[in-house]
Amino acid sequence: MIDRVRLPLTVKVLIALADLKGKVGNSARRKLLRRLRKRSLLDFEQRLATLGPRDVCIDLGANMGVVTEKLAATGAEVHAYEPDPYCFDLLTKRFADKENVHLHNQAVSATAGSLLLQRTRDFEIDPEIQSQSSSIIRSNDAIYDPEKSIKVEVVAFNDVIRDLHRYVALIKMDIEGSEFEILDCILDDYANGCVLPIGALFIETHERHMPNRFDLVKSVRKATWSGLLPYRIDTYWP
């Protein structure tokens, strides 16, 4: 177990109000999101300061490599996963001289296999921006063009962790919907007595696009704040 997360009284009040319906609940959720996103970024920077060459980090959904760059600057061994070939080509050039950065042209989800990576209809207009929305999960969203989808390899999250044979100090996860399946997997494993060698996870969750997953995110947040999980899972990564 980890220590309980100490939340300011104002945040605790907003958490309680966020469960309400109507304008009060909507307002509380917006305020809570703003506050805890700032807190998430601060916590991330503080954890970066503790990393060094002996540590291992993972960037899931590396995209253009902004976070990968920050992780690599600590001297830690960084494994960056990015399924989109456009982004991966840029990552390959950006980190060509970084011996501590290992790039993987794969998507990560709960199970291994192959899936179609959906690209937006406007991908060619501005691929650097549009690639941030590429997803192997959100196929029914109107912003995607089925004709622009590409087949990508998917590796299982648990395999990624176990194949390293190392403790993973920090994971950043921004994978456009696949995070829910991974969270399900993490919680199921823990319920069955399996604790992965992980320190902290910073996850951007996309329940606004998948409302049926809101309860999962809510339960993960409460479990983390209460110190009931062996990992620090921050689901307010912006």
What are these regions (language model features)?
Residues 2-238:
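Phosphate/nucleotide-binding beta-alpha loop and adjacent structural elements of enzyme active sites
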